[in-house]
């Protein structure tokens, strides 16, 4: 092991910081004063790769019982153990959330084998979490019993003292004898419980990392290290090699934790056969070793700290033989992703790990029965269905073991495809009718098995018709009450003929195919009809490309459609092909974005009033989306179970095998309004459905809530949170995610007040946006006829409103893409901008889009199509900059872009020619200018960097410029771009920004040596305050406050520990 290849220091001037918290102690008084505990770092949780070495006499847990109880020590160890177990649980919960989200993202572009592997990981993590929870309950139970015995023992002890001081008598002596017996019993019980608790402490895996010393270790030196922990021993010898490496005869050892006992470490230098020089001996605390993550410690062996022993200690709550699941196993997850492209378009014909089955929808062959899917399911579904007498019995027939409402998953939509490149999908048609409750039998003799297949179910008849080449599915919902009417479809009952009538407006389906399956169910029309105008329902198209038939039926019946009028906003439009990038925001549903925001907000909710205001508005919005008032109530709540059961009876067509019973909160929000293009063929059908049945959503949703107790909640409802408009749903998700990002930045920069204030102002504006969205969601979307109804202030900015309407498309007016806005800006303003500043139009438009999105760096062209801009972002940006005319504002941005261009010319060598044109008076404090200035400071040319440095120093005298620059550069320190971080450090140096000292101190903990060096130099350049901060960092890094930084920031998460170099790189965490 090469000690030189590791850095055990957070970055002091000498490269290694002295350990002050873990010096151990010996018989000397001054060394006792240095006794402290092991410390913890934040390296990634590791999985043991193999069975590690144990002492030969430690094959079993401790069975010896202590002679005397140690209640104070037990309490300390219990607290440490409980914290460690809770931390383990939290780490695994985080990993479970990440894997679940990854599974959901992969469902659309992956195959069955990949999903199966990932789901196995999820199941393993869940099992391990359940085991942890059970382990925690056992520990709590033992400690509770221990506390009871301790109180009894204390009581008996006090009674002993009382009787000892009282006059002696026969009764007193008898009582004292009884008390002594009880006291002994309670003491033995405490000792027994201590032994049992000790068996639940898990294992410490200690890995030898080598010795480190300041010019103390020489090639050829031999050392012997002896560790003693109770009755456990570990002795190993090592030698310092010529190349600086160290060779040791042992690398790792497992110690069983003890309640009473400290680890004693003795290091001796071997000079000869009988010559051993004691280097040092220390005794170390162990209670702080109960942590979920591996900890690297540097132990001061001698008084001066010139010899350090580096160990990596990992605690496992269970035996190492019981290998933990791969939490944080990034390599396996990435391997899964690499394998995604290796799978063909077909899916394996293998059953999954649940009661569901996956079926491969093959292209029909001439000699192949065309109803193979129904034949395969006949034994498991239709046989049971044949014996049922009503739809209320159907929940017991479901293939899924779940009770209650079905949880709809989102597997790839091509799960019914075959392996060929061009596949043809077979349509299914579901027709609901009021059929008499009588047994139906298939024809006695059928010429072709697939021509007619009629089950004997009293409620569902299936008839096969000819194949239709068009890959589309129709579900015709036909109401009838009591007897046959023009909407009834008569199925054959023993004969090959069939009669069929269609009301006006219905399109007769083709009878030339043989691959359509019609399923008829008795569903009373009163559930879907409450007024005279809802007397009939038009055919509703279902698309097999959507993959989930049942979900489409629920979604179609519950979509919040309204009558389509020319003056209405096109906010109910579905996501079309031109806006594929928007789908990711629907995949990341409102529930997920809401959960992410609340998780980020919860620990810090009491710190700022703005956090509390945002929390209140977000919860208000959540309540509105959960409890949106239905248009009208169902006439009979009992009828809702009929529809629910009828839809659940089609679960055999559902492709969701990866849903868990408790996975209801993982719904993907596709938006109720997005049903138009998915289910309807023509605008006539869309408008007729909207006109006649706007209350369908209200009926079904309210009925399900009444009868099942499950409404539109996140966890239990088949209906995901939605406003009824895809566009508004995307807008909500975008702003929830932006609020989460702001909270994370506020938490990171909370020690820099001027940055925090600016971020809190942005968060306050987002709170107002949430309030506005809640008002819009409360109202019926059909009553909003223009954006001025949603944002009344747009009346004062009609030119901006007109441009926004040009940027929006059929997917809705509440959002657009950055790509669309760029194209529209080019159409409307390119000529004007290029006339004023030739060649800068595209640059100016990109700057505008980046600023609307509140990005510190320009938006990449490759991500333009997927970047979402909401109408609230658009309006708030121009309102905050007091812009009424977009054209004039673009010309202003063009002048700023010309300044950036001049700065770039300085980089190209035209220094003397352009530096005179740039001075502190005409230098605008815009982020593009500030970014260009900072990046120029990174130039290797001294002439360029010196010129820019003098320019920044001069502009620092301008109070307005300096304030804007400080805010931008401090926010840049939180970005993952290392070059931008370095440039921001240099810029703060020349601005003499003493306000940024605390953020620079945090950067001094970075693993990147260049960043650490620049941050340290910047600290030292900030006068006395900076020097003192650097010295404090050098001498006592453990005094730094813990940073609570989210993973999106990609910055080191520092903890209040010492003797560590905890760093974050672009690839991930590293710990030394």
From Swiss-Prot:
InterPro entries: ARM-like, ARM-type_fold, FAM65_N, RIPOR3. Residues 683-698 have a biased composition (Basic and acidic residues). Residues 173-470 are annotated as: Necessary for interaction with NCAM and myoblast protrusion formation. Acts as an inhibitor of the small GTPase RHOA and plays several roles in the regulation of myoblast and hair cell differentiation, lymphocyte T proliferation and neutrophil polarization. Plays a role in fetal mononuclear myoblast differentiation by promoting filopodia and myotube formation. Maintains naive T lymphocytes in a quiescent state and prevents chemokine-induced T lymphocyte responses, such as cell adhesion, polarization and migration. Involved also in the regulation of neutrophil polarization, chemotaxis and adhesion. This is Rho family-interacting cell polarization regulator 2. Homooligomer; homooligomerization is regulated by RHOC and leads to the formation of concatemers through the association of N- and C-termini. Interacts with NCAM; this interaction is necessary for myoblast protrusion formation. It is found in: Cytoplasm; Cytoplasm, Cytoskeleton; Cell projection, Filopodium; Apical cell membrane. One of its GO terms (molecular function) is 14-3-3 protein binding. The gene is RIPOR2. The keyword Cell membrane applies. GO terms for cellular component: apical plasma membrane; cytoplasm; cytoskeleton; filopodium; stereocilium; stereocilium membrane. Residues 83-112 form a coiled coil. Residues 439-465, 683-718 are annotated as: Disordered. Expressed in myoblast and myotubes (at protein level). Expressed in brain, eyes and skeletal muscle. It comes from Coturnix japonica. Belongs to the RIPOR family. Residues 447-460 have a biased composition (Polar residues). Pfam families: PL48. Keywords: Cell adhesion, Cell membrane, Cell projection, Chemotaxis, Coiled coil, Cytoplasm, Cytoskeleton, Differentiation, Hearing, Membrane, Myogenesis, Signal transduction inhibitor. GO terms for biological process: cell adhesion; cell differentiation; cellular response to chemokine; chemotaxis; muscle organ development; negative regulation of cell adhesion; negative regulation of establishment of T cell polarity; negative regulation of protein localization to cell leading edge.
């Amino acid at each position: 092991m090469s000690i030189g290849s590791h850095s055990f220091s957070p970055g002091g001037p000498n490269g290694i910081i002295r350990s002050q918290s873990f010096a151990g102690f010996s018989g000397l008084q001054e060394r006792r004063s240095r006794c402290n505990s092991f410390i913890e770092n934040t390296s990634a949780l590791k999985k043991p790769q193999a069975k590690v070495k144990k002492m030969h006499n430690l094959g079993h847990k401790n069975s010896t019982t202590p002679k005397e109880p140690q209640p104070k020590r037990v309490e300390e160890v219990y607290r440490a153990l409980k914290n460690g177990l809770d931390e383990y649980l939290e780490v695994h919960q985080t990993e479970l959330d990440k894997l679940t989200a990854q599974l959901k993202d992969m469902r659309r572009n992956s195959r069955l084998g990949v999903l199966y592997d990932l789901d196995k990981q999820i199941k393993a993590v869940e099992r391990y979490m359940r085991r942890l929870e059970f382990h925690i309950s056992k520990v709590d139970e033992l400690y509770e019993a221990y506390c009871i015995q301790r109180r009894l023992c204390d009581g008996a002890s006090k009674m002993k003292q009382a009787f000892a001081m009282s006059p002696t008598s026969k009764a007193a002596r008898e009582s004292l004898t009884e008390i002594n017996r009880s006291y002994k019993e309670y003491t033995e019980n405490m000792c027994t419980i201590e032994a049992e608790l000790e068996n639940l402490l898990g294992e410490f895996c200690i890995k030898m990392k080598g010795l480190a010393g300041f010019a103390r270790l020489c090639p050829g030196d031999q050392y012997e290290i002896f560790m003693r922990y109770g009755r456990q021993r570990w002795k190993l010898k090592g030698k310092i090699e010529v190349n600086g490496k160290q060779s040791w005869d042992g690398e790792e050892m497992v110690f069983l934790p003890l309640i009473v006992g400290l680890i004693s470490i003795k290091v001796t230098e071997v000079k000869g056969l009988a010559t051993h020089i004691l280097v040092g001996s220390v005794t170390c605390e162990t209670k702080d070793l109960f942590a979920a993550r591996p900890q690297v410690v540097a132990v001061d062996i001698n008084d001066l700290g010139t010899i350090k022993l580096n160990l990596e200690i990992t605690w496992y709550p269970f035996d190492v033989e019981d290998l933990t699941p791969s939490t944080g196993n990034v390599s396996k997850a990435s391997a899964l992703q690499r394998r995604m492209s290796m799978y063909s378009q077909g899916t394996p014909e293998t059953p999954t790990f649940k009661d569901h089955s996956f079926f491969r929808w093959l292209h029909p062959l001439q000699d192949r029965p065309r109803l193979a899917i129904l034949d395969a399911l006949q034994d498991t579904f239709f046989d049971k269905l044949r014996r049922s007498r009503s739809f209320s019995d159907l929940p017991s027939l479901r293939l899924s073991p779940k009770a209650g409402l079905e949880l709809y998953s989102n597997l790839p939509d091509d799960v019914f495809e075959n392996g060929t490149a061009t596949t043809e999908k077979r349509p299914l048609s579901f027709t609901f009718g009021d059929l008499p409750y009588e047994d139906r039998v298939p024809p006695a003799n059928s010429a072709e098995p697939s021509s007619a297949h009629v089950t004997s179910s009293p409620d569902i008849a299936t008839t096969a018709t000819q194949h239709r080449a068009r890959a589309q599915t129709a579900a015709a919902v036909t109401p009838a009450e009591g007897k046959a009417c023009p909407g009834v479809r008569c199925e054959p009952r023993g004969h090959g003929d069939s009669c069929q009538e269609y009301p006006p407006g219905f399109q007769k389906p083709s009878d030339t195919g043989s691959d359509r399956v019609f399923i008829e169910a008795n569903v009373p029309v009163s559930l879907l009809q409450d007024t005279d105008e809802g007397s009939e329902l038009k055919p509703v198209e279902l698309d097999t490309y959507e993959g989930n038939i049942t979900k489409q039926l629920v979604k179609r019946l519950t979509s919040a459609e309204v009558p389509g009028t020319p003056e209405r906003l096109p906010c109910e439009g579905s996501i079309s092909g031109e806006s594929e990038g928007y789908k990711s925001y629907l995949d990341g549903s409102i529930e997920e974005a809401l959960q992410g925001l609340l998780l980020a907000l919860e620990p810090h909710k009491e710190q700022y009033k703005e956090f509390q205001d945002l929390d209140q508005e977000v919860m208000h919005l959540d309540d509105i989306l959960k409890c949106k008032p239905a248009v009208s109530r169902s006439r009979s709540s009992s009828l809702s179970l009929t529809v629910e059961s009828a839809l659940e009876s089609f679960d055999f067509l559902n492709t969701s095998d990866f849903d868990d019973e408790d996975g209801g909160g993982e719904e993907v929000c596709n938006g109720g309004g997005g049903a138009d293009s998915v289910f309807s063929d023509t605008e006539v059908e869309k408008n007729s459905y909207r006109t006649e049945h706007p209350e369908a959503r209200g009926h079904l949703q309210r009925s399900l809530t009444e009868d099942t107790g499950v409404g539109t909640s996140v966890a239990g409802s088949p209906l995901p949170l939605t406003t009824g408009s895809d566009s508004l749903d995307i807008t909500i998700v975008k702003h929830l995610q932006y609020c989460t990002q702001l909270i994370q930045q506020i938490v990171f920069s909370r020690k820099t007040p001027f940055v925090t204030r600016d971020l809190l102002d942005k968060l306050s504006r987002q709170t107002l946006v949430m309030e506005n969205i809640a008002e819009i969601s409360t109202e019926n979307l059909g009553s909003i006829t223009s954006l001025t109804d949603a944002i009344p202030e747009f009346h004062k900015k009609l030119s901006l409103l007109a441009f926004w309407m040009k940027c929006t498309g059929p997917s809705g007016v509440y959002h657009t893409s950055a790509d669309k806005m760029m194209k529209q800006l080019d159409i409307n303003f390119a000529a004007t901008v290029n006339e004023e500043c030739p060649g800068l139009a595209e640059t100016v438009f990109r700057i505008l889009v980046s600023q609307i999105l509140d990005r510190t760096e320009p938006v990449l062209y490759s991500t333009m199509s997927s970047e979402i801009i909401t109408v609230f972002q658009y309006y708030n940006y121009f309102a905050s900059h007091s812009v009424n005319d977009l054209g004039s504002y673009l010309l202003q941005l063009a002048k700023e872009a010309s300044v950036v261009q001049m700065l770039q010319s300085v980089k190209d060598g035209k220094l003397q020619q352009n530096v005179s044109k740039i001075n502190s008076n005409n230098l605008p404090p815009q982020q593009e200018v500030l970014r260009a200035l900072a990046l120029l400071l990174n130039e290797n040319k001294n002439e360029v960097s010196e010129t820019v440095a003098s320019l920044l120093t001069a502009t620092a005298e301008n109070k307005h410029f300096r304030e804007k620059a400080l805010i931008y550069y401090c926010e840049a320190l939180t970005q993952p771009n290392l070059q931008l971080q370095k440039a921001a450090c240099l810029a703060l140096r020349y601005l003499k920004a003493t306000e940024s000292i605390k953020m620079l101190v945090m950067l001094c903990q970075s693993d990147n040596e260049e960043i650490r060096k620049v941050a340290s130099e910047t600290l030292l350049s900030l006068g006395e305050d900076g020097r003192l901060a650097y010295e404090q960092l050098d001498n006592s890094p453990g005094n730094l406050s813990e940073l609570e930084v989210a993973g999106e920031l990609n910055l080191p998460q520092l903890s209040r520990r010492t003797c560590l170099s905890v760093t974050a790189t672009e690839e991930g965490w590293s710990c030394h």
